[in-house]
């Protein structure tokens, strides 16, 4: 009996020890099944072993604005962890801010806007917006910011003479949102570059100053011409040869031979449909500078337009763009431009010969992730009149960056005239990038072009090049000087540029993104995959269990796999992750009911499926993008985070 008692006691102790070592999951958000409570840490916050500042500090260098999961709530303290597998320590509750929706901001490019000013409160911001002389006050305020002579109403500003370094992760969480005017939001945000906090384990030194744009290293620009080489494009091919030769001559004369490189990628259409086309897309030459020009010039001399027509008027231009993004040696260049030249739209999503899953919006986001700007030159000929509207919309979307399209249309019935206009665009780009090199090494800035209606295609091309050059110089200086984001604990900004608002125009200051963990992105990928599989199955078989099939495949996330589906949206059924609930965007997928699906025509169903396939392809690229995943000090890959733009959600 005594031995049995000892055995039972030992067993009980072992069980208690095991239980004490088993980590609890974070607290769930109210009303949620899978979403955990989160906060973000403030500067100076530390993690303690116990809920007392007299206990041992277990993390002195806690990165400011680190997202933390809440495991336990005490009196004025929170037990938190960087991941979902264990708690790391206790933090003072007043040194955190609740952040359950995980919305963050990214600065938009500066090609058309002023630096963002961070205001102390909404009253200061509203005073500016309500002022009858708003434009004049903004000019005075920007001058005061530049001279660092602002009043207490301004707490910080985006750097004046460079962009924030795009290669440095910064977090700008949205803490509160108001909409005092239709179409314009006031956002309460925090903003800190964690690498700039003295004493932090992430501290990386002072970095460059935004007020001095001079750098020791001149920027290098890579321009990739992505050329349609189907029937009728020979004049443009020949013009590109002459253009590159002329630019190389000038670069060598001005001692800039190593600072601008050209690459050439050709595209046609499906060789499965028409084998005589020879290729869908091919890299004619990787980047070559003027010093090695013979290599590119000899290869360009071999390029000819196709001898046969393709299976459709639209061509596989997205295959050419994707090939350029993935295959060229961009890493050697600071500024990166794709110059797309075509007289047809991209293959639509319902064309079975399309070789790339991503659609224009997803391709634009993919290029942006790689730091590449796309300039689309769309040649509008009489033969393609019925295609012009579709192609223009597609290429505006493809070349869109933060609300501004780098799109140039050329209306012409004469190929030689069209080729001349194309040369004007490319020449303007090259000259502007040469200016960027020269002025940057002299410590001078390009002037941001004024908003003025162009009088002709050449003037339009020059303005486009100037806007692009201005933005690229700011981006380069941001990287070269390692310019940090403003260090602000709490402040107010507008989502639109104030100077343009004063003129009744809308130019975005910021882009909204949601911080997704790798686990959430994997779930989203699986859920979208299940929707696609069941959509294709029911489309082929005419079966009527579309939603039930999705529920069966998504049993882990669905609120109830046996729930009646009639009249319910996918969001109400809980098929998609709860992290999408309440986000400020309108989701075509989340609002879909089973009745909606069966009311769609075959063509509409196919288009819906293809849009989801495009998102799926983009998520796979996010997963591959190791550079932009942020760990926040957790070793669990499932808890790493990525800033996914709202328009990339399904």
Predicted regions, residues:
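Von Willebrand factor
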Residues: 217-341, 346, 380, 384-387
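Loop/turn elements at helix/coil->beta-strand transitions in domains of secreted/extracellular proteins
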Residues: 221, 257-263, 330-338, 345, ...
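Acidic, polar low-complexity linker/tail segments
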Residues: 166-224, 230-238, 250-253
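P/S/T/G-enriched low-complexity
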Residues: 365, 380-650
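SH3/SH3-like beta-barrel superfamily modules
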Residues: 58-94, 143-177
């Amino acid at each position: 009996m005594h031995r049995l008692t000892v055995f039972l006691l030992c067993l009980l102790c072992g069980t208690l020890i095991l239980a004490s070592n088993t980590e609890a999951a974070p607290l769930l958000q109210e009303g949620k099944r899978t979403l955990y409570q989160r906060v973000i840490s403030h500067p100076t916050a530390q993690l303690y072993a116990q809920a007392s500042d007299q206990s041992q500090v277990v993390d002195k260098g806690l990165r400011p604005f680190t997202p933390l999961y809440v495991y336990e709530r005490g009196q004025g303290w929170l037990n938190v962890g960087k991941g979902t597998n264990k708690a790391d320590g206790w933090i003072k509750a007043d040194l955190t801010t609740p952040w359950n929706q995980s919305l963050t901001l990214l600065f938009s490019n500066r090609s058309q806007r002023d630096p963002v000013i961070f205001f102390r409160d909404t009253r200061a911001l509203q005073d500016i917006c309500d002022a009858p002389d708003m434009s004049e006050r903004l000019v005075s305020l920007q001058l005061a910011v530049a001279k660092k002579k602002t009043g207490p109403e301004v707490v910080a500003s985006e750097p004046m003479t460079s962009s924030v370094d795009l290669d440095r992760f910064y977090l700008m969480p949205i803490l509160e949102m108001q909409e005092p005017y239709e179409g314009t939001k006031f956002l309460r945000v925090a903003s800190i570059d964690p690498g700039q906090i003295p004493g932090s384990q992430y501290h990386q030194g002072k970095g460059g100053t935004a007020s001095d744009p001079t750098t020791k290293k001149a920027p290098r620009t890579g321009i990739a011409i992505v050329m349609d080489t189907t029937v009728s494009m020979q004049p443009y091919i020949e013009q590109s040869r002459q253009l590159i030769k002329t630019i190389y001559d000038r670069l060598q004369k001005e001692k800039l031979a190593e600072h601008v490189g050209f690459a050439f990628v050709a595209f046609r259409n499906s060789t499965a449909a028409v084998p005589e086309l020879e290729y869908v897309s091919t890299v004619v030459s990787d980047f070559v500078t003027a010093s090695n020009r013979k290599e590119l010039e000899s290869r360009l001399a071999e390029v000819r337009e196709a001898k046969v027509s393709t299976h459709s008027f639209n061509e596989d231009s997205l295959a050419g763009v994707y090939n350029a993004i993935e295959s060229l040696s961009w890493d050697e260049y600071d500024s990166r431009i794709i110059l797309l030249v075509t007289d047809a739209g991209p293959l639509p999503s319902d064309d079975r010969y399309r070789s790339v899953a991503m659609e224009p919006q997803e391709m634009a986001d993919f290029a942006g992730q790689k730091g590449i700007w796309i300039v689309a030159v769309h040649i509008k000929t009489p033969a393609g009149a019925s295609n012009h509207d579709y192609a223009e919309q597609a290429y505006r979307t493809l070349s869109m960056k933060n609300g501004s399209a780098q799109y140039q249309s050329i209306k012409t019935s004469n190929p030689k005239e069209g080729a001349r206009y194309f040369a004007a665009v490319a020449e303007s780009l090259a000259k502007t990038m040469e200016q960027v090199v020269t002025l940057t090494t002299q410590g001078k800035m390009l002037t941001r072009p004024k908003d003025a209606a162009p009088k002709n295609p050449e003037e339009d091309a020059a303005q486009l090049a100037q806007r692009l050059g201005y933005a690229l110089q700011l981006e380069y200086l941001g990287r070269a000087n390692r310019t940090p984001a403003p260090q602000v604990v709490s402040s107010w900004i507008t989502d639109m540029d104030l100077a343009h608002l004063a003129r009744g125009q809308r130019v975005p200051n910021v882009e909204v993104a949601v911080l997704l963990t790798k686990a959430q992105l994997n779930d989203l990928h699986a859920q979208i995959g299940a929707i696609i599989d069941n959509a294709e199955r029911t489309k082929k078989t005419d079966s009527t269990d579309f939603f039930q099939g999705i529920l069966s495949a998504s049993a882990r996330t669905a609120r109830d796999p046996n729930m009646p589906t009639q009249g319910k949206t996918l969001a109400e059924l809980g098929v998609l992750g709860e992290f999408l609930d309440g986000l400020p965007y309108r989701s075509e997928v989340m609002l879909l009911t089973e009745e909606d699906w069966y009311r769609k025509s075959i063509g509409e169903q196919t288009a819906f499926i293809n849009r989801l396939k495009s998102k799926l392809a983009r998520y796979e690229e996010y997963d591959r993008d190791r550079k932009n995943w942020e760990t926040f000090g957790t070793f669990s890959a499932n808890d790493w985070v990525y800033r996914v733009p709202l328009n990339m959600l399904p």
